[in-house]
Design a protein with these regions (language model features):
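Serine residues within intrinsically disordered or low-complexity segments
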Residues: 26-27, 31
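A glycine-rich helix N-cap at a beta->alpha junction
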Residues: 111-120
Length: 132
């Protein structure tokens, strides 16, 4: 959420008017100190990230957090349609953004009714073999 006073600063700095109008047209919430404007982040997913046997993107350049959540929701929808009460195992690597990506993916999975087991920091083969 952005404070409406911040919008005035943007106007003074002659920031992109289209961006400002988009912000102004978002839903508005009042508080004691100032007016807040809710800015929803649009999901971004580069379709070229989907490969034959996996998916790979540069985060956040090719996919953002809402996009990751949507991929989790799509995956969860596929899993839940073929199995009753599925358990999906997830893990993450050492990269600085991996935890954020994993959490958004889990959010998408949970929204479909999948059960999730998070095994934390691990190698890819660990996730694969953890299903047995």
């Amino acid at each position: 959420m952005l404070c409406a006073d911040f919008l005035n600063t943007l106007y003074k700095l002659k920031i992109n008017r289209t961006f400002i109008e988009h912000i102004k047209n978002s839903s508005i919430k009042k508080s004691n100190k100032c007016t807040y404007i809710n800015m929803e982040v649009e999901k971004k997913i580069d379709p070229l990230g989907f490969r034959e046997y996996d998916a790979r993107w540069l985060y956040p350049k090719s996919i953002n957090s809402k996009g990751i959540e949507a991929v989790g929701k799509g995956f969860g929808t596929q899993v839940i349609s073929s199995e009753k009460n599925p358990i999906v195992i997830v893990g993450n690597d050492y990269r600085s953004y991996s935890e954020e990506v994993k959490n958004n993916f889990i959010k998408g999975l949970l929204s479909t009714g999948c059960n999730v087991k998070d095994i934390g920091l691990c190698l890819s083969p660990t996730v694969y073999f953890s299903q047995f």
